[in-house]
């Protein structure tokens, strides 16, 4: 009997999409360890940490100061400690799938990399230039998927094409109450296109 492969799923908790992806990975016989991060819950642990971050951001012009502070604070949370413990218990993950790789600091990615036996894979569900921090994190991934055709042209990094999510687990028989819906973040420059659709 083959042992199930373990995959670490790391992504934002936005809209609960991680639950569907996690369910699909389980359906495809993966042991899934999920790290769903809710950025909206971030608070600085102290006034000093907040002031140090602001100082780095404005005096040293460190554009990543807040980003790095968030990542460091997160690594001290019980959620991160739980994930680390789970990875230790299973002897590390076979794979890691990151959606929105821009959220994490290099230190965090380096720590996770040490727990992954095979491939670390990323998917940037927004265009690469919407969250420019992602460019600094490319080195940590074996494969990097993007959906926006603009991201394929003119870059030295070899991106791989992918569409948005395809979930192949059996769906519940729900009656349809609408014929069109949109799940995503509101961007005013997309509004006219959606209305005309």
Predicted regions located by residue number:
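Nucleotide-sugar donor-binding catalytic core of glycosyltransferases
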Residues: 2-53, 67-68, 75-83, 90-91, ...
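Compositionally biased, intrinsically disordered low-complexity segments
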Residues: 51-54, 58, 79, 115, ...
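Glycosyltransferases and closely related glycan-assembly transferases
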Residues: 26, 85-95, 105-120, 139
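Aromatic- and Gly/Pro-rich amphipathic surface segment
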Residues: 56-69
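A generic structural signal for ordered secondary structure
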Residues: 1-2, 7, 110, 119-121
């Amino acid at each position: 009997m083959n042992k199930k492969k373990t995959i670490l799923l790391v992504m934002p908790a936005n809209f609960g999409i991680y639950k569907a992806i996690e369910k699909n990975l389980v359906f495809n016989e993966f042991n899934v360890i999920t790290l769903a991060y809710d950025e909206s819950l971030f608070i600085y642990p102290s006034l000093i940490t907040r002031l140090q971050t602001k100082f780095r951001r404005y005096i040293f012009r460190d554009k990543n100061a807040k980003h790095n502070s968030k990542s460091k604070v997160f690594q001290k949370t019980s959620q991160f400690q739980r994930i680390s413990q789970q990875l230790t218990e299973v002897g590390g993950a076979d794979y890691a799938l990151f959606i929105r790789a821009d959220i994490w600091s290099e230190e965090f990615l380096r720590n996770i990399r040490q727990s992954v036996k095979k491939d670390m894979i990323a998917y940037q569900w927004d265009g690469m230039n919407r969250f420019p921090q992602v460019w600094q994190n490319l080195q940590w991934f074996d494969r990097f998927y993007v959906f926006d055709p603009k991201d394929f042209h003119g870059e030295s990094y070899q991106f791989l094409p992918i569409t948005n999510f395809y979930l192949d687990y059996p769906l519940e028989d729900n009656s349809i109450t609408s014929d069109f819906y949109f799940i995503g973040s509101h961007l005013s420059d997309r509004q006219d296109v959606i209305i005309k659709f």
